[in-house]
Amino acid sequence: MKDLLPDLCDLYPEKLQIAEPIFTSYGKRSHFYGEVVTVSCFEDNSRVRELVAENGKGKVMVIDGGGSKRRALLGDMLAEKAVDNGWEGFVINGAIRDIAAQSQLNIGIHALCAHPMPTEKRGLGDLGKTLRFAGMTIAQGDYIYCDLNGIVVSKQPLALP
C-alpha cells in the first residue's frame, strides 16, 4: 500500500485543505479518492440511503452529521449497497456501526467513531450543500483524497504520483 497523502502534500501544498486528525479508517480500502458528493444530516441517514442507491463511480460521499456520536449514519446494509453501486468511499463527520462487517467491504470509510444505535428515519437532511468540519470547507464537486495518513481536499482533480 502506497502512502498517497504525503506525496500529494509534497506536490500540491498550496492546493490542499488538510483535515484535522479526528477520523478513523474503517473500510477494507484505507486508500480512496474521488469527486465529492455532500450530505448534511443530523442523526437521520434518510438522504444517505437515497444516495447509495445511485451510481457512485468515481465519487466519495462526504456526510456532515454535526459530529454526533449518538447515532450511526452508516451501517453494513447501506455500505453494501454503496459497494454494489460503485461508490469509492465515505467521509463521515459522525458515527458508523457494524464495524466488523464494514471492514470486509471493498470501500473506503473514514468516520469519527463507532456507535451501535441506528439513526431515526425522518426524511431530513440536505444534499449538495457546502460543508464545514474538521478545519475544512468542502463543496459539492471538490475532490477528496484519503489514506491512513488522513484526508485532504482540493478544488480540482490532482494528478496522482
From Swiss-Prot:
Keywords: Lyase, Metal-binding
Top EC class of this enzyme: lyase
Superkingdom assignment: Bacteria
Any single Pfam family the record assigns to this protein: RraA-like
UniProt: a divalent metal cation binding residues: D98
Cofactor annotation comment: Divalent metal cation.
Molecular function per GO: 4-hydroxy-4-methyl-2-oxoglutarate aldolase activity; metal ion binding; oxaloacetate decarboxylase activity; ribonuclease inhibitor activity
BP term (GO), one: regulation of RNA metabolic process
EC number: 4.1.3.17, 4.1.1.112
Catalytic activity: 4-hydroxy-4-methyl-2-oxoglutarate = 2 pyruvate; oxaloacetate + H(+) = pyruvate + CO2
CDD domains linked to this entry: RraA_family (cd16841)
Family, per entry: Belongs to the class II aldolase/RraA-like family.
Protein name: Putative 4-hydroxy-4-methyl-2-oxoglutarate aldolase
